[in-house]
């Protein structure tokens, strides 16, 4: 233990280093990292001698965040590229537990940033979620608390703890720590090398397996892994399994109405349903709405599986009701997908998947509406309406209110949805005017040959 403490306190010095960019004995394949900075820009770097970067051309943003006089640490939850659904669920739950712990105790004085570890080349399944913790005081208590946190994680997956510091030449390095048999040991050290930003955000290849599920079975597999610790997951699965997989829309029109919170969506959907003598359905449906708060408190992969399966339950209801009358749906698949994309893709608008990317395509096994309307209002109008509602906010409602970049990513994702796309409706005018506009769009859509 004394040896571990000496390593923990000791400076990074010459004898510790091997060939360029890596400590002796630590020749792991280079991985890349993307760090979301406070201004929503992204900084990419790699570790190791063979990393395809340029150590002689440092990124000043990395030097400011990882170098002295403050102290920075990385904490990543490992997931192998070939990991199954159960492993991804366990990793997501550990990531969320770590997030809660990093907001308490000695960590409260630290700056917490979003960090993603990934394999180069756009390989699906290789993204690892994590954090960068920036201690402004370089307090040994922070390091000790992190090592204790690492030691408390006895079950797989165990997080990887890295510590950043600069050598006498000003080059950045990362030490990697593990806790083995109660001993805290340094197990690796590699140079931090800036690398170019890849053409596609590295989390995008993982979206279909983690949050934007391409079909019913993919979402179902996630909740199946949750039944041992979320009893309500079994109830949701039982309801989904009662819904036929092969369904068809009836002869009457089906219109889905989408929009951010406080765009007047609830009022418009009810008014349109009354005007058309239509059945009004909501996603998630009432049969699982009682469990919404439970799943909203879970990691994104579980939360999105819940909402995705809710869409399939709604689809079954649509098929039944559209045989008898028109159907208006308050939110549907587009809502589930857009919030997931905006949440998972770090950075700004420019980092979203490009237009026409497959992630924006409607699932082939989910019943499609005839028309999708997207209600929009100005940010100022939406904020004013939110403040007047006085209702408890979901995590995403609070994020929309506090984070303009997140709101813009949600709106852009809505606009990039295809097959079917969204018809944008300005919901800023009076309720009567908005209702008239919506009814006119519906009438024109169904009167076209």
UniProtKB/Swiss-Prot annotation:
Keywords: ATP-binding, Coiled coil, Kinase, Mitochondrion, Nucleotide-binding, Pyrimidine biosynthesis, Transferase, Transit peptide
Coiled-coil segments: 380-412
Entry's transmembrane regions: none
Localization, UniProt: Mitochondrion
Binding site for ATP: 259-266
Tissue specificity as recorded in UniProt: High levels are observed in myeloid, lymphoid and mesenchymal tissues.
The protein's Enzyme Commission number: 2.7.4.14, 2.7.4.6
Disease affiliated with this protein: Basal ganglia calcification, idiopathic, 10, autosomal recessive: A form of basal ganglia calcification, a genetically heterogeneous condition characterized by symmetric calcification in the basal ganglia and other brain regions. Affected individuals can either be asymptomatic or show a wide spectrum of neuropsychiatric symptoms, including parkinsonism, dystonia, tremor, ataxia, dementia, psychosis, seizures, and chronic headache. Serum levels of calcium, phosphate, alkaline phosphatase and parathyroid hormone are normal.
Organism: Homo sapiens (Human)
Expression triggers: By interferon-alpha. IRF1 is crucial for the transcriptional activation of CMPK2.
Molecular-function GO terms, alphabetical: (d)CMP kinase activity; ATP binding; CMP kinase activity; dCMP kinase activity; dTMP kinase activity; nucleoside diphosphate kinase activity; UMP kinase activity
Keyword Coiled coil annotated: yes
Family: Belongs to the thymidylate kinase family.
GO biological process: cellular response to lipopolysaccharide; dTDP biosynthetic process; dTTP biosynthetic process; dUDP biosynthetic process
Cited function: Mitochondrial nucleotide monophosphate kinase needed for salvage dNTP synthesis that mediates immunomodulatory and antiviral activities through IFN-dependent and IFN-independent pathways. Restricts the replication of multiple viruses including flaviviruses or coronaviruses. Together with viperin/RSAD2 and ddhCTP, suppresses the replication of several coronaviruses through inhibition of the viral RNA-dependent RNA polymerase activities. Concerning flaviviruses, restricts RNA translation when localized to the mitochondria independently of its kinase activity.
GO CC annotation, single: mitochondrion
Keyword Mitochondrion annotated: yes
Highest taxon of the lineage: Eukaryota
Transit peptide location on this chain: 1-98
Enzyme class: transferase
Annotated gene: CMPK2
Gene3D superfamilies according to UniProt: P-loop containing nucleotide triphosphate hydrolases
Lineage start: Eukaryota, Metazoa, Chordata, Craniata, Vertebrata
Name used for this protein in its record: UMP-CMP kinase 2, mitochondrial
Main location: mitochondrion
Substrates-to-products reaction catalysed: CMP + ATP = CDP + ADP; dCMP + ATP = dCDP + ADP; a 2'-deoxyribonucleoside 5'-diphosphate + ATP = a 2'-deoxyribonucleoside 5'-triphosphate + ADP; a ribonucleoside 5'-diphosphate + ATP = a ribonucleoside 5'-triphosphate + ADP
């Amino acid at each position: 233990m004394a040896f571990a403490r000496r390593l923990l306190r000791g400076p990074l010095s010459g004898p510790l280093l091997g060939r360029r960019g890596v400590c002796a004995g630590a020749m792991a394949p280079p991985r890349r990292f993307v760090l979301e900075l406070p201004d929503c820009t992204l900084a990419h770097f790699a570790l190791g001698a063979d990393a395809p970067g340029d150590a002689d051309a440092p990124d000043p943003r990395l030097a400011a965040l990882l170098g002295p006089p403050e102290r920075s640490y990385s904490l990543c939850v490992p997931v192998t590229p070939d990991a199954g659904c159960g492993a991804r669920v366990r990793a997501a739950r550990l990531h969320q537990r770590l997030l809660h712990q990093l907001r308490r105790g000695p960590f409260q004085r630290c700056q917490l940033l979003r960090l993603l570890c990934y394999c180069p080349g756009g390989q699906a399944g290789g993204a690892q979620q994590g954090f960068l913790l920036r201690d402004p005081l370089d307090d040994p208590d922070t390091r000790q608390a992190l090592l204790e946190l690492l030691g408390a994680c006895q079950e797989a997956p165990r997080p990887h703890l890295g510590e950043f510091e600069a050598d006498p030449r000003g080059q950045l390095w990362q030490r990697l720590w593990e806790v083995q048999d109660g001993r805290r040991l340094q197990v690796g050290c590699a140079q931090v090398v800036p690398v170019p930003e890849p053409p596609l955000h590295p989390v995008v290849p993982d979206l279909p397996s983690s949050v934007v599920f391409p079909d019913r079975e993919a979402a179902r597999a996630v909740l199946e892994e949750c039944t041992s610790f979320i009893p309500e997951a079994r109830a949701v699965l039982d309801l989904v399994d009662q819904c036929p997989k092969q369904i068809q829309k009836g002869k009457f029109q089906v219109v889905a109405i989408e929009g951010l919170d406080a765009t007047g969506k609830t009022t418009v959907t009810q008014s349109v349903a009354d005007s058309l003598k239509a059945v009004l359905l909501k996603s998630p449906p009432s049969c699982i709405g009682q469990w919404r708060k439970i799943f909203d408190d879970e990691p994104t992969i579980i939360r999105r599986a819940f909402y995705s399966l809710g869409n399939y339950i709604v689809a079954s209801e649509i098929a039944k009701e559209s045989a008898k009358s028109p159907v208006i749906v308050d939110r549907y698949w587009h809502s589930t997908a857009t919030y997931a994309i905006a949440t998972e893709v770090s950075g700004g608008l420019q980092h979203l998947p490009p237009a026409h990317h497959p992630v924006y395509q409607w699932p082939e096994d989910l019943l499609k509406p005839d028309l999708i309307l997207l209600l929009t209002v100005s940010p100022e109008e939406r904020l004013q309406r939110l403040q007047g509602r006085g209702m408890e906010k979901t995590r995403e409602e609070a994020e929309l209110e506090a984070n303009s970049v997140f709101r813009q990513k949600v709106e852009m994702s809505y606009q990039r949805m295809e097959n079917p796309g969204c018809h944008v409706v300005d919901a800023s005018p009076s309720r009567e005017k908005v209702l008239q506009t919506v009814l006119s769009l519906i009438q024109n859509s169904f009167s076209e040959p």
